[in-house]
């Protein structure tokens, strides 16, 4: 995803936004995977276009541009790194089931602010497929509040009783079983016809 500041191009009254995509597929220099304009063998038909939501958003002078969240289970710490459009005070508030468990503030310097918050011992709730617990976080700037969420979980590779390396989630062996689904939607290729179609 990417964004563009179009402030300088806006005019009073009605404006029109035109979004276009040009893709040379295997005739261009960009990465393309196994797509070719002339498919065959292991190569799939070329596809390009707008396949995710495009929108206009009015933002204040100081707004969140990017947020990175990194959990560390052994230390009960979660690190937040935020990029903002201009230097300002940034507040980080973590809640678990509506209860505040961590809060910190930092001033962005060169459009960057970061904090490491340690969760109280009684607030550590690790994520798993059987217990998909999520924490909520509010990132507050002078004129904007952004909400997101994260999970506390740790992936490791540890030997089992026979010395065979196993993937472990939060210290417990877990079987990873994936599916390679290279099917495309008939009408939209990458874009499904509806949210319901993705579930079935």
Task: Tell me what each language-model feature is.
Residues 1-63, 86-87, 99:
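Accessory beta-strand-rich segments of carbohydrate-active enzymes
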Residues 2-8, 112-122:
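Exposed aromatic-hydrophobic patches
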Residues 10-14, 27-29, 119-134:
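Short glycine/proline/serine/threonine-rich loop/turn segments at secondary-structure transition edges
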Residues 16-19, 131-142:
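Short, aromatic- and glycine-rich surface loops/edge beta-strands on solvent-exposed regions
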Residues 22-29, 142-145, 171:
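Short acidic/polar inter-strand loop motif in beta-rich domains
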Residues 57-62, 66-68, 145-200:
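Active-site-adjacent substrate/metal-binding segments within catalytic domains
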Residues 70-76:
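Short, solvent-exposed loop/linker segments at the N-terminal edge
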Residues 76-107, 113-116:
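Beta-strand-rich binding/interaction modules
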């Amino acid at each position: 995803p990417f964004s563009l500041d179009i402030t300088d191009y806006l005019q009073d009254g009605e404006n029109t936004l035109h979004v276009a995509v040009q893709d040379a597929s295997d005739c261009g220099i960009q990465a393309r995977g196994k797509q070719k304009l002339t498919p065959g063998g292991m190569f799939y038909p070329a596809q390009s276009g707008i396949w995710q939501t495009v929108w206009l958003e009015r933002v204040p002078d100081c707004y969140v541009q990017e947020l990175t969240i990194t959990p560390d289970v052994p230390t009960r710490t979660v690190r937040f790194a935020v990029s903002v459009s201009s230097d300002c005070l940034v507040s980080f508030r973590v809640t678990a089931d509506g209860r505040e468990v961590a809060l910190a503030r930092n001033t962005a310097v060169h459009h960057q602010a970061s904090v490491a918050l340690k969760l109280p011992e009684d607030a550590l709730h690790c994520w798993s497929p059987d217990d998909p617990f999520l924490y909520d976080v509010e990132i507050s700037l002078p004129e904007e509040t952004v909400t997101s969420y994260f999970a506390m979980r740790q992936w490791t590779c540890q030997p089992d009783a026979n010395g065979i390396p196993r993937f472990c989630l939060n210290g417990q062996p877990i079987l990873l079983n994936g599916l390679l689904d290279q099917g495309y939607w008939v009408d939209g290729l990458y874009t499904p016809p509806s949210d319901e179609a993705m579930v079935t």
